[in-house]
Amino acid sequence: MPSQPSKTLETFDNPRPDHDYTIRIEIPEFTCLCPKTGQPDFATILLEYVPDRQCIELKSLKMYIWSFRDEGAFHEAVTNTILDDLVTVSRPRFMRVTARFNVRGGIYTTVVAERRAPDWEPTTPVALP
């Protein structure tokens, strides 16, 4: 049975909830439709998050991202929708979604949206020589 687009996101238990660590996922084939022209918009989505109790399952993420391909959406709105949906299902300590849209009319658009759990403070990064 072939895979179908889906708005259903799945998670799995974080194997190391006692550690702060960052998961970075790059999705180079995001598409949606321009709500003004109906033309396709293409973007690379970068998802960065510090999981708490749940991690995002990758196949469901792929099908979720694929579900936008026939939907009209402004760049700002779709980026924040993706963030909101991912935060709702996974409840991370921190999450950032960066959407780098391909050029349209001579203009590149990058939208960055992030959320932080109110009780989470990041550790200080180590500065290596």
From Swiss-Prot:
<keyword id="KW-0671">Queuosine biosynthesis</keyword>
<comment type="similarity">
    <text>Belongs to the GTP cyclohydrolase I family. QueF type 1 subfamily.</text>
</comment>
<feature type="binding site">
    <location>
        <begin position="75"/>
        <end position="76"/>
    </location>
    <ligand>
        <name>substrate</name>
    </ligand>
</feature>
<feature type="binding site">
    <location>
        <begin position="56"/>
        <end position="58"/>
    </location>
    <ligand>
        <name>substrate</name>
    </ligand>
</feature>
<dbReference type="GO" id="GO:0008616">
    <property type="term" value="P:queuosine biosynthetic process"/>
</dbReference>
<dbReference type="GO" id="GO:0005737">
    <property type="term" value="C:cytoplasm"/>
</dbReference>
<dbReference type="InterPro" id="IPR029500">
    <property type="entry name" value="QueF"/>
</dbReference>
<dbReference type="GO" id="GO:0033739">
    <property type="term" value="F:preQ1 synthase activity"/>
</dbReference>
<comment type="function">
    <text>Catalyzes the NADPH-dependent reduction of 7-cyano-7-deazaguanine (preQ0) to 7-aminomethyl-7-deazaguanine (preQ1).</text>
</comment>
<comment type="pathway">
    <text>tRNA modification; tRNA-queuosine biosynthesis.</text>
</comment>
<keyword id="KW-0963">Cytoplasm</keyword>
<dbReference type="Pfam" id="PF14489">
    <property type="entry name" value="QueF"/>
</dbReference>
<dbReference type="InterPro" id="IPR016856">
    <property type="entry name" value="QueF_type1"/>
</dbReference>
<protein>
    <recommendedName>
        <fullName>NADPH-dependent 7-cyano-7-deazaguanine reductase</fullName>
        <ecNumber>1.7.1.13</ecNumber>
    </recommendedName>
</protein>
<dbReference type="InterPro" id="IPR050084">
    <property type="entry name" value="NADPH_dep_7-cyano-7-deazaG_red"/>
</dbReference>
<keyword id="KW-0521">NADP</keyword>
<dbReference type="GO" id="GO:0006400">
    <property type="term" value="P:tRNA modification"/>
</dbReference>
<dbReference type="InterPro" id="IPR043133">
    <property type="entry name" value="GTP-CH-I_C/QueF"/>
</dbReference>
<feature type="active site" description="Thioimide intermediate">
    <location>
        <position position="34"/>
    </location>
</feature>
<feature type="active site" description="Proton donor">
    <location>
        <position position="41"/>
    </location>
</feature>
<keyword id="KW-0560">Oxidoreductase</keyword>
